UniProtKB/Swiss-Prot annotation:
Its cofactor is pyruvate. Keywords: Autocatalytic cleavage, Decarboxylase, Lyase, Polyamine biosynthesis, Pyruvate, S-adenosyl-L-methionine, Schiff base, Spermidine biosynthesis, Zymogen. This is S-adenosylmethionine decarboxylase proenzyme. The gene is speD. Binds 1 pyruvoyl group covalently per subunit. Catalyzes the decarboxylation of S-adenosylmethionine to S-adenosylmethioninamine (dcAdoMet), the propylamine donor required for the synthesis of the polyamines spermine and spermidine from the diamine putrescine. The active site is at S113 (schiff-base intermediate with substrate), H118 (proton acceptor), C141 (proton donor). Is synthesized initially as an inactive proenzyme. Formation of the active enzyme involves a self-maturation process in which the active site pyruvoyl group is generated from an internal serine residue via an autocatalytic post-translational modification. Two non-identical subunits are generated from the proenzyme in this reaction, and the pyruvate is formed at the N-terminus of the alpha chain, which is derived from the carboxyl end of the proenzyme.
Amino acid sequence: MVKPLPRLRLQGFNNLTKALSFNIYDVCYARTEEERQRYIEYIDEQYDADRLTQILTDVAEIIGANILNIARQDYDPQGASVTILISEEPVIDKKQAGKELISDAVVAHMDKSHITVHTYPETHPQEGIATFRADIDVATCGVISPLKALNYLIESLESDIVIMDYRVRGFTRDVKGKKHYIDHKINSIQHFLAKNVKSRYEMFDVNVYQENIFHTKMHLKDFDLDQYLFEERAKNLSFKERMKIETLLKREIEELFHGRNLSE
């Protein structure tokens, strides 16, 4: 739960911008070119624009935002994108329901409060590795906090590796004229994760407190080969095959987690 600082009396609107960025990876091994293609098709179907729209709509509800507009697109040969514009307050007076309106709130929030997701399925040309990356951004202005959606997003996607960045920008001014550059307590993104999530992942932080920048990356603690095989079971493989595939997968996970290629 996001713990606010003692309530401030503000001069006008809360102008703080809070941005949460996710990169979520699913890693898989598919033995043949045909299996790798079926993996891409499976991911493309599982995370098409309709499914992603539902996930982001749920995020908007969780953080207490109002949806202004939704744009979504499936791509050929694969991938999808969804963008939802949101606001802190309802933008249409109930008395005006059914009438065509151009709300000032829409213009005011279009470049500040939004939720976006883009998907990137891909495969290794020779080694059988296939990955899926979901790139998610939740940016809000005002008192709405994107941190409330952390656990839901991790549980909604096949999250072998999660890389998160959170930053607060701008300032809000109280009635005495003093500027405040953050309006809630935070030492680490980890503090906003549920216990059952933290128990499953190894986590690592890089935080720049004086700049209100917080970075956490994590990967699953337990390695179960069956969870990474596509259309195959570990028991059907020879010991040598299992060791080879396990080595490839662990290397891929480590490289994605650290964001760099390891030396041979």
